[in-house]
From Swiss-Prot:
Name under which the protein is recorded: Translation initiation factor IF-2
UniProt binding sites for GTP: 417-424, 464-468, 518-521
Recorded GO MF terms: GTP binding; GTPase activity; translation initiation factor activity
Residue ranges of the region described as G3: 464-467
Family: Belongs to the TRAFAC class translation factor GTPase superfamily. Classic translation factor GTPase family. IF-2 subfamily.
Residues covered by region (G4): 518-521
Region called Disordered, residue ranges: 80-142, 153-172, 195-309
GO CC, one annotated term: cytoplasm
Biased composition (Basic and acidic residues): 80-94, 101-113, 214-256, 273-284
HAMAP family according to UniProt: IF_2_B
Record-annotated tr-type G domain positions: 408-578
């Protein structure tokens, strides 16, 4: 089901946290409202959540108001930050202006000078006067008019238009326009007096510039503060705009001088903050470098470095967040003890016991806790519980192999595709043996693992998976252990559902696909159509510009098989498949298939993935352990050891493992037994709790009997993979009225225990490629039990479907059989009204159900009380004849009414 189709569910504790109320209050309300919940970690649906929000509406309103206030506060803070940022940018612009023109920016006079004419000083005193950083002169004549220059230097009223323009750039508030001709002088530009006189060298200039930096920064900071305050006052007063100053106005000049001097006096009264000279120089250098690098390769490199730095910081933050989240997650099995849970959380067991006591549960240090209790305890101590299987919890840790220890290994290739598309026939030709002859119905029903040697000492391990839809789990397991998938599609058929499923399994496991279009020797073969359908399924072959290799083959004639093998080996070389071939490392593998042999015991097919598996190695696999008694290849020949990518049959298991379990060699029998026992204890606890719940559920079903019918089944098969495929296929067959209930499933022959269980639970026994022993057969005949034997899996599914359809209530259909018209009404004493009718169509029977229609409206529905022709009682009347009848319990009949006869027909339902 898609996520859109699922109904949203909410945890009670999360709802309580959202409303900021006690979870117990919410739990109490849900129980009163009729909700079936056990604890505060239980889930409720959307309607119940809406009911909770309505009940706690006052609390929700308070929470919403608090959230709104918090958001408004955050908005105000963000606005203040934005305002501070803009203020900082203005300061930076002022500093940039200074760094670009330090001597012009220093042209503002610092003292108020009277407007009277001042006598010019001698020329020899000029260096001392001009040495101040505020002085910039304006001259229009050569050096002999130095007196006039000195006069203009001391008079701020007679500043030139260029000097005023510089001041406008700095202040950004008032635009000044000063007459160009003052005192009879013509202004052409500004001139640095010291440079014009040729006094002082480059070293003196640098020293003077450094001395002036601090004073300039102080002045600019004071002026900026004054301007900002004045601008704020003006905005408060109504934001009146300043009028431009007219040319030639003496009042304007006086006002300008007075306002400038007043601002400077006001600025002097305020204590200047001390600014570090190194900070100023650093800011100026960074600003200048930024202005210089606004374009070109340097700017792009700088941006790239900055982006890389931001990305690294972001990656570090994400990694830290992931580590923090992982630290707060504990991986625990479902029925862990209080002591084990305390060890995982790093606390004392007594703290868990105390917390359970406050919850109303009395536990001991070795008592096993259920899932809900573990979640609540972990949440209380700030952890999130992630439940894992008992195998994952006791997983054996291994040291990772070094790169120099790895060697090239043969690829593991899985052949996938739809039923009867030629997967096993392809493997037949490669192995030069007839595998199909050994399979019932000509279809593969096990995962077969085979090793094939090609030219040049090259080897490939093949896994042949079933193509029938019941073997979805098998195909998924095959995709997990494989390196390359050969997708077989018949050229005379099309891309079928199992073909698409195989593609999805391969893509989900990240396994490359090599397409083999089979049966090209047939006359109706159409490989191009197959390629088109594959492209629609997301597999675009290389011939069409895609990335998937494709080869047209004929598995019967051998056409294109060698080219297909070359493409598989090429794909393997690209992937650089490696494994550790050292004999010192403990071996590891995957159990592909497991079965119970009458003479050998438990036999499992293991695909070795690391190291060499030898006879005598102790191992653990899933819930069982053992010691390797014998190793055999796929042809039954005994071998001494098996290396990576080699399939091998292993004897020596104490119990039957499950397909897909991890096979790990242990240092000793004792360690292997300890791990297996831990897993068995957890599994037994899980099965015990589950069986208890099943019994309670069955009691509830007995109370509601009649709502659901069940077909109880006991499954016995030859291999674990077949059991899983059968169980998956049968559990899919159900509807709202009937379903299959698997009482027991196992590998091996049918025993007396199975027969007794079937007799007690009224179940049928299904044997898939297994037979009962003598005692079980005799007992089954005595108990008159239904025992069925099959060798093809879809025959089992078809028979179970038919059995379930027989348990369904039939559909009832109404079938019209005839209609009569009332043409006369007779009143008969002690009987009532009798209708004289004419049979319009069909037939009417004495026991027929009838309805009375008047003007097309039904006014009676019942049965006939009598049916006569003339004075004789009859069983039926055909069309075209007249008859008399009266209705049982009804006498209000009139001329012109229609009597319609019908019967109820039962129709068999389908699943």
């Amino acid at each position: 089901m898609s996520p859109e189709g699922k109904e949203m569910r909410y945890r009670i504790s999360d709802i309580a946290r959202e409303l900021q109320v006690s979870p117990q209050e919410v739990l109490h309300f849900v129980k009163e409202a009729g909700g079936k919940v056990a604890s505060t970690s239980s889930m409720v649906k959307g309607p119940m959540r809406d009911l909770i929000l309505d009940q706690f509406s006052d609390e929700k309103k308070l929470v919403d108001e608090t959230r709104k206030i918090r958001e408004e506060k955050q908005l105000r803070l963000s606005r203040l930050e934005e305002q501070s940022r803009k203020t900082y940018e203005k300061e930076q612009q002022l500093k940039d202006t200074i760094s670009g023109r330090p001597e012009r920016a220093a042209a503002k006079p610092r003292t108020e000078v009277p407007s009277e004419s001042v006598e010019p000083e001698p020329v020899k005193e000029m260096p001392e006067t001009v040495a101040e950083p505020e002085v910039t002169g304006v001259v229009s004549e050569p050096d002999e008019n130095v007196a006039a220059v000195a006069e203009e230097v001391k008079s701020p009223v007679e500043e030139t238009s260029e000097t005023v323009a510089e001041k406008n750039d700095v202040e950004g508030q008032v635009s000044y326009e000063v007459p160009q001709k003052i005192g009879g002088l013509t202004v052409f530009g500004t001139l640095d007096v010291q440079s014009s006189l040729g006094m002082g060298g480059e070293a003196d200039k640098k020293k003077q510039r450094k001395k002036r930096f601090k004073e300039q920064a102080d002045e600019l900071k004071d002026e900026f503060d004054i301007k900002a305050k004045e601008g704020g006052k003006e905005r408060e007063a109504g934001g009146e705009s300043r009028k431009p100053v007219k040319k030639g106005s003496e009042e304007t000049k006086k006002t300008t001088v007075e306002s400038t001097s007043a601002k400077k006096k006001k600025g002097k009264k305020k204590k200047k903050p001390e600014v570090d000279e190194k900070t100023i120089e650093k800011n100026i250098r960074s600003t200048i470098s930024g202005m210089d690098d606004t374009s070109g390769s340097g700017s792009s490199r700088q941006k790239f470095r900055k982006m890389r730095k931001i990305e690294r910081e972001k990656e570090l933050e994400e990694a830290e967040a992931i580590k923090e989240a992982e630290r707060s997650i504990i991986r625990v099995t479902e029925f862990a003890t209080a002591h084990e849970l305390a060890d995982l959380m790093g606390i004392l067991p007594k703290e868990i016991i105390q917390h359970c006591f406050t919850m109303g549960k009395f536990v001991t240090i070795n008592q096993r806790l259920d899932k809900e209790t573990i979640e609540l305890v972990a949440m209380e101590f700030g952890f999130d519980a992630e439940f894992v299987s008992e195998v994952e919890a006791t997983e054996v840790t291994e040291i990772e192999d070094e790169e120099e220890e790895l060697e090239i290994r043969p690829p593991v290739v899985t052949i996938m595709g739809h039923v009867d598309h030629g997967k096993t026939s392809l493997l037949d030709y490669i192995r030069s043996s007839n595998v199909v002859a050994g399979e019932s119905g000509g279809i593969t029903q096990h995962i077969g693992a085979y090793e094939v040697s090609l030219d040049g000492d090259r080897k490939i391990t093949f896994l042949d998976t079933p193509g029938h839809e019941a073997f979805t789990a098998m195909r998924a397991r095959g995709a997990q252990v494989t390196d390359i998938v050969i997708l077989v599609v018949s050229a005379d058929d099309s891309v079928m559902p199992q073909t698409v499923e195989a593609i999805n399994h391969s893509k989900a496991a990240g396994v490359p696909i090599v397409v083999a279009i089979n049966k090209i020797d047939k006359p109706d073969a159409n490989p191009e159509k197959i390629k088109t359908q594959l492209s629609e399924a997301g597999v675009l072959v290389e011939d069409w510009g895609g990335e998937y290799q494709c080869q047209e083959i004929s598995a019967k004639q051998g056409t294109g098989i060698d080219a297909l093998m070359e493409k598989v080996l090429t794909e393997a070389e690209i992937r650089e498949l490696k494994a550790n071939f050292s004999e010192d490392v403990p071996s590891r593998g995957i159990i592909v298939e497991a079965e119970l042999d009458k003479g050998k015991g438990v036999v499992s097919t293991v695909l070795v993935q690391r190291g060499f598996l030898k006879v005598g190695d102790p191992f653990v696999a899933g819930h069982t352990m053992g010691k390797v008694r014998a190793l055999m290849d796929e042809r039954g020949k005994r071998i001494r050891e098996a290396g990576p990518s080699q399939p091998v049959s292993v004897l020596g298991f104490e119990d039957l493992p499950q397909s897909g379990d991890l096979f790990t060699v242990m240092p000793s029998d004792r360690e292997a037994r300890e791990i297996a026992q831990k897993r068995q204890i957890i599994r037994r606890e899980h099965e015990f709790r589950r069986s208890t719940r099943v019994k309670l559920d069955s009691i509830a079903r007995q109370i509601k009997e009649g709502l659901m019918k069940e077909l109880s089944v006991i499954l016995k098969a030859d291999t674990d993979g077949s059991i899983q495929a059968l169980a998956d296929g049968l559990m899919k067959i159900h509807n709202d009225e009937v379903k299959v209930q698997i009482i027991h499933q196992g590998v091996g022959q049918i025993t007396e225990t199975d027969v007794l269980l079937a007799a007690a639970s009224d179940a049928i026994i299904i044997g898939f490629r297994v037979r009962p022993n003598v005692n079980a057969k005799r007992l089954a005949e005595k108990e008159d039990l239904d025992v069925r034997f099959y060798s093809v899996i879809y025959h089992v599914i078809e028979d179970i479907e038919q059995a379930l359809e027989g348990m369904l209530s039939p559909e009832l259909h109404e079938e019209s059989i005839g209609s009569l018209e009332i043409r006369q009404v007779f009143k008969v004493p002690k009987i009532g009204n009798v209708a004289g009718c004419y049979m319009l169509e069909g037939k009417i029977f004495r026991d027929s159900k009838v309805r009375l229609l008047r003007d097309g409206v039904q006014i009676y529905d019942g049965v006939l009380d009598s049916l006569k022709r003339f004075k004789d009682d009859v069983k039926e009347v055909d069309a075209g004849y007249e008859c008399g009848l009266n209705l049982k319990g009804y006498s209000d009949i009139k001329v012109g009414d229609i009597v319609e006869g019908y019967r109820i027909v039962e129709k068999k339902r389908k699943l």
